[in-house]
From Swiss-Prot:
Protein name: Putative pterin-4-alpha-carbinolamine dehydratase
Upper lineage: Bacteria, Pseudomonadati, Pseudomonadota, Gammaproteobacteria, Lysobacterales
InterPro entries on file: PCD_sf (IPR036428), Pterin_deHydtase (IPR001533)
Pfam families linked: Pterin_4a
Keywords carried by this UniProt record: Lyase
UniProt EC number: 4.2.1.96
SUPFAM superfamilies per UniProt: PCD-like
Family, similarity comment: Belongs to the pterin-4-alpha-carbinolamine dehydratase family.
Entry keyword Iron: no
Keyword DNA-binding: no
One Gene Ontology term of the molecular function aspect: 4-alpha-hydroxytetrahydrobiopterin dehydratase activity
Coiled coil regions, renumbered to chain: none
Amino acid sequence: MTDLIPLEQAHCLPRKGSDHKLGEARLAELLPQVPGWELAEAGMALTRTFRFPDYCRTLAFVNALAWIAHREDHHPDLGVHYDRVVVRYSTHDVGGLSENDFICAAKTARLYDQGITG
């Protein structure tokens, strides 16, 4: 699906059932496309910590990320702290990671890299 266009330009599709859970080979293909992200929980989740100079910019990032999550209908778990946000993606309906997680990880990284909050 996302092999033809960059992940950050793709859009999430409804995914339910274990048929959409990514296997180890596909995870190995997609992970290099989202630098800075790590597999967590034995490959069941994708995580990354984003750092900010102050709380205002931290919350600006969270609010911008909320808009992306709403638009894609794919929502991360967030750990919000004064100077950082821990973002965790996993697709509960497939019991692990789906392509939607990588699409949203790429969009999240682009948001951060573009300096939307600063």
